[in-house]
Amino acid sequence: MAAAQHRPVMLEEAVRALAPSGGDVVVDATFGGGGHSARVLRELGPGGRVVGIDRDPEARGRAERLLGDPRFSFEQGPYDEVLWRMVGRGERADALLFDLGLSSFQVDDPRRGFSYTREGPLDMRMDPGSGPSAADFLNAAGEAEIAGVLSEYGDVPRAQARRVAREILRRRPLRTTADLREAVRAAVGWAPRGGNPAKRVFQAVRIRVNDELGGLRRALEAAERLLVPGGRLVVISFHSGEDRLVKRFIAEREGRCTCPPELPVCVCGARPVFRRGPVLRPSEREVAENPRSAPARMRVAFRTAEPAREAS
């Protein structure tokens, strides 16, 4: 199989928001193909440092080309766990990037089971050696749980989600991506417009299998402690659930006063932990050149000197 080509999304916009310079420490929490890390290293001085993190064991091989640079290091594991280990070691960072979702390496490899267009084992784990696979989940969960996952994580209409869940139960055990794709086809058909419903189903199952939203929340709470005052948080998301979580996290930490309007002074003690930055979308040119970038949304926030909120 030809090697997949991964193009980092919103590369220049992300690097401008990260604003790396001099001796900064920059954490690339979703290393992927290393495009963002390589670009940041070009901007740093000899005393700077980039820490790359990726849950996918195959990412370590892609990091080899950068490991010859003494300013670069790589840690393999879920980003929330790695970031909290860094917090425990007393480390700090000047900028931190999350480029969420899948890399082209993962989507285009049928052995990983992420794509409904490529037949392979029904796996979908970011780390194939860790935790239950998509097949394990779908072959064990009840109808209500499966339908809830499809609605919550894939924005599948509830009636459709129930039909798909019933069809999955009827066809169990599911073993391949084709098994799941055909269950979706039998349950709701293929719409000529509006996108293939299998795309949302596969997305929802993947998010559930990898606990992506839970991991993101824990990682953002770690980032809150890692970033120095003035530190830059940059998050590129591709799914409405991810974006809502990031937006809510930043809003909760903007320190907006909740006192009744009739009070002359603030007594609620609200203090901003982050200042909200810009929200950006990919340019028309980037979307034309790389259609996978179309749903991307980039949120930026700046750390203040206020103490971190209590972790959930």
Curated annotation (Swiss-Prot):
**Matching Pfam families:** Methyltransf_5 (PF01795)
Q: Does the entry feature the keyword Cytoplasm, yes or no?
A: yes
- Enumerate the GO terms in the molecular function aspect: rRNA (cytosine-N4-)-methyltransferase activity
What intrachain disulfides are recorded? none
Gene Ontology cellular component annotations, sorted alphabetically? cytoplasm
- EC identifiers of the protein: 2.1.1.199
Q: Which compartment or compartments is the protein found in? A: Cytoplasm
* Keyword hit for Aminoacyl-tRNA synthetase: no
Q: Which InterPro entries match?
A: RsmH, SAM-dep_MeTrfase_MraW_recog, SAM-dependent_MTases_sf
Catalytic reaction annotation? cytidine(1402) in 16S rRNA + S-adenosyl-L-methionine = N(4)-methylcytidine(1402) in 16S rRNA + S-adenosyl-L-homocysteine + H(+)
Q: Which GO terms describe its biological process?
A: rRNA base methylation
Entry-linked NCBIfam families: 16S rRNA (cytosine(1402)-N(4))-methyltransferase RsmH (TIGR00006)
Instruction: Family membership, please give it.
Output: Belongs to the methyltransferase superfamily. RsmH family.
- Please give the function described in this protein's UniProt entry: Specifically methylates the N4 position of cytidine in position 1402 (C1402) of 16S rRNA.
Q: What is this protein called?
A: Ribosomal RNA small subunit methyltransferase H
Species assigned in the record: Rubrobacter xylanophilus (strain DSM 9941 / JCM 11954 / NBRC 16129 / PRD-1)
What is the organism lineage in this UniProt record?
Bacteria, Bacillati, Actinomycetota, Rubrobacteria, Rubrobacterales
